[in-house]
């Protein structure tokens, strides 16, 4: 208020309010109850930014981009008809159990014959569909990417727009959950997954890279 007065702002101070006062809270609560009565309020399963150390949601404004060492891993998905493999490059092999689809650009002739078909994930033998989407980058890696729930914002967009399955494998503490994701029924795949349970994402990344190398 002092700053506003010194700046000479024309303000009706009788209308002053704060966002945490009783009047503001009542107005907010009434507004929500009105939306609920109209059927405009709903619950929905959706991803969020999460801090695994403090166990709390994180605002976009709190994020910082940092460079760190990484590596591309080339992973072979097996065509369901047995006609060969589809290679993808990823820096996040630990998300392989959370893979729900492969995505390529609709104009990429290399993968157009695959659209609408399925492939199987290595190690876990889960069948996933192959889709076309304009956000896929033809000139990045092999030009086809795995969509996992969730590695980045692009995964979220693909998951929503293509109405993909949810296979969340990382718990609130940042470790691999004990319950195998949906679709994983292969005995060998279940054994591979069991070896990851309780590991951090970084530990799981190393383990899956080693398993892929040995397979």
Q: What does each model-found stretch correspond to?
A:
Residues 6, 10-11, 15-17, 21-179, ...:
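NTP-handling and nucleic-acid-processing catalytic cores
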Residues 199-215:
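Phosphate/diphosphate-binding loops
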Residues 182-202:
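Acidic, Ser/Thr-rich peripheral helices and adjacent loops at domain boundaries
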Residues 1-3:
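Short, charged, amphipathic alpha-helices and their helix-cap/turn boundaries
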């Amino acid at each position: 208020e002092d700053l506003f007065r010194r700046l000479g702002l024309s303000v009706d101070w009788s209308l002053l309010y704060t966002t945490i006062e009783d009047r503001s809270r009542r107005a907010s609560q009434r507004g929500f109850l009105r939306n609920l009565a109209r059927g405009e309020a709903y619950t929905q399963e959706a991803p969020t930014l999460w801090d695994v150390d403090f166990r709390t949601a994180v605002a976009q404004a709190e994020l910082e981009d940092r460079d760190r060492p990484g590596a591309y891993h080339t992973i072979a998905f097996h065509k369901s008809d047995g006609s060969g493999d589809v290679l993808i490059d990823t820096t996040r092999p630990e998300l392989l159990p959370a893979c729900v689809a492969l995505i390529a650009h609709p104009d990429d002739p290399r993968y157009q014959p695959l659209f609408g078909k399925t492939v199987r994930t290595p190690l876990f033998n889960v069948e996933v569909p192959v889709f076309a989407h304009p956000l896929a980058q033809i000139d990045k890696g092999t030009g086809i990417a795995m969509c996992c729930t969730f590695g980045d914002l692009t995964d979220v967009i693909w998951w929503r727009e293509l109405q993909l399955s949810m296979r969340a494998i990382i718990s609130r503490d940042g470790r691999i959950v004990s319950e195998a994701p949906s679709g994983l029924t292969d005995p060998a795949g279940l054994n591979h997954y069991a070896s990851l349970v309780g590991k951090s994402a970084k530990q799981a990344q190393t383990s899956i890279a080693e398993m892929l190398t040995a397979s």
